[in-house]
């Protein structure tokens, strides 16, 4: 698992000197941080370390080894266990594997956070699977970015009702969340069939350079059930990050295909191959949900606001990496669009969905409210001056209107200037 990560990140000039979760935390916190971090132990990394990309259930010995890794990480301070079941290698895990691993996290008081298996053809089935894992493991659960795909064939009302029934009738601790945008990020290479990119970077590059693979992939885009076609086709996907073609950022794939003078399939291959071993960081954005479904999800009182972004910065080793606009200004967009403009929420409720609600869902005691004996994590902003400075072709930009940020009682940002203070802590602590 570590070798896969290193291969995809080698151009960040980062030294991965750790082999265990505790060593990772030491590397993360020893230089000091300006923010608090509640790390989750990732199922995908553990499965890769034990089984690679094997598309089968683990043997008893393999499962015990994975359980030991989860136990080790939880003992080191992880806040919980996370899965991404729509993607490899998580998609190869069955319920027995997930319950066993989640139970280890639960024994340490951890939570279970999941990108569920499917939000389209088997949306309800995937939610029920997650509820069963939460139920049998005996831990709180968080179902992430839960809006249905635009082409989902199951009613969202019924999915939400199933979640509320589990909460109300069984007292299961279940939270849900979403980012406040109909657009979602993704690596360009994942438009291709999983067998192309599920491997170490060098092997993936060998496949990407094969004319036979190009032809096989071309056939998949003729299938009307193809994920890309169901989301509107090539004109509905936009490039957001490419080191080799920064001038094309913001253009859709139909336009890029015309500029390259090749068909859609070759366009994808040309984009990902141009960045060599860094191909996984060639990024796109696409429609995540309909405005109606997103609004319905946001209106749920148990729905927290999250970014679905990554840690990045417009300077340093990550300055050229763009995930999507959600890494910056997502809170500003939520307040501007849904609190100020549409008035779907009071300001107080909007802030609750970004503070005490997610803190409680993650079991972060003493966080998320301005109360005596609570940690002084405080943000002061000017409602009138709030401005989202990101755009589709320039998604990395800080907002206006944030006057002060205090973390654990120390000022880390004031009037747009970083104080260089490093008061961040690992949570829960």
Describe the predicted segments one by one.
Residues 210, 296-303, 308, 312, ...:
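C-terminal cap of metal-dependent C-N hydrolases
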Residues 86-88, 118-119, 148-149, 180-181, ...:
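Short, glycine-/Ser/Thr-/acidic-enriched flexible segments
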Residues 37, 77, 115, 177, ...:
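Divalent metal-coordination and catalytic microenvironments
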Residues 1-19:
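Metal-associated gating/positioning segment near the N- to mid-region
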